[in-house]
Amino acid sequence: MDNTLQRLQNAELEILDEIMRICDANDIHFVMMGGTCLGAIRHKGFIPWDDDIDVGMYREDYNRFKEICKKELDSKYFFQDFDTEKNCGFIFGKIRKNNTYMVEEYAKEIEMHKGIWIDIFPFDYVNDDFTVFQKEYKKLLFLRNLFIVKQGFKVKHDAPIAVKISYSMVRCIRGLLSASSLKNKMMKLMTKYDDTKTNTMFPYGCAWKEKELISKDEFFDTIRVDFEGRKVPVFRSYDKYLTSLYKDYMTPPPIEKRNSGHDLRNVKFDKEN
């Protein structure tokens, strides 16, 4: 395995251990998502070529975790979201490792913490009617894109043409609303059903879109499985979850598609940001 990828995975495991320490000590429900869940089930650890870890939390737990981090998070790390760092354009959180460097191309010019990270996605209750959910999700995506452009983030170079066109359109109206107004509108929309508690939950910041919809019962029902020598929580219904995301998830992709998701050439370990 490439030494940089191995070192990156080890750094992320350190961050994961810190997240788990805080969650377990404070009875915070969390779960492995996406490729991290797949890696745990298929490889009992990282997918060999994977370079990130994704964690999910119910919004209420996410907010509690965020508050606890102010006092209990080890000084080696930093909790980042659009509240803790004004230039942040993400609608989810990250735990970053201080004195390291890893940045995605679209955020390269943004003045913010750029340490090695783990993503933490808050799950919110959403409308049980899929048609209504889709309308509200599209509205959220529009606001998110407007917010990202407002913060100075660039569109990914490999984004679909439709996405690039939408970003171009958004740039034309980015001056109509302030960043704080956009944050308030997004938060109001994302947490719209959190008090009424529907039967469906969703992580608005995720990459898999509607495929990540999950029932309330399935979200809170987890089991612990092996992951790089530690036990991590995954959905008990992981077969249903992973099939939705990857279909035949136990069959690895062809060799030519086994690529790291990020450019690892500029990753720095134990360096000042």
For each predicted feature, which ranges?
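Conserved catalytic core of two-metal-ion nucleotidyltransferases
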Residues: 1-24, 69-128, 148-245, 252-273
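Active-site nucleotide-donor binding segment shared across nucleotidyl transfer reactions
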Residues: 20-53, 62-63, 217, 244-245
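Short active-site oxyanion
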Residues: 53-54, 230
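Short, His- and charge-rich active-site/binding loops that engage polyanionic ligands
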Residues: 137-140
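Short hydrophobic/aromatic beta-strand micro-patches
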Residues: 56-58
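Helical lid/core segments from catalytic subdomains that handle acyl or acyl-like groups
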Residues: 143
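Conserved SAM-binding loop
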Residues: 65-67
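A short secondary-structure junction signal
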Residues: 130-135
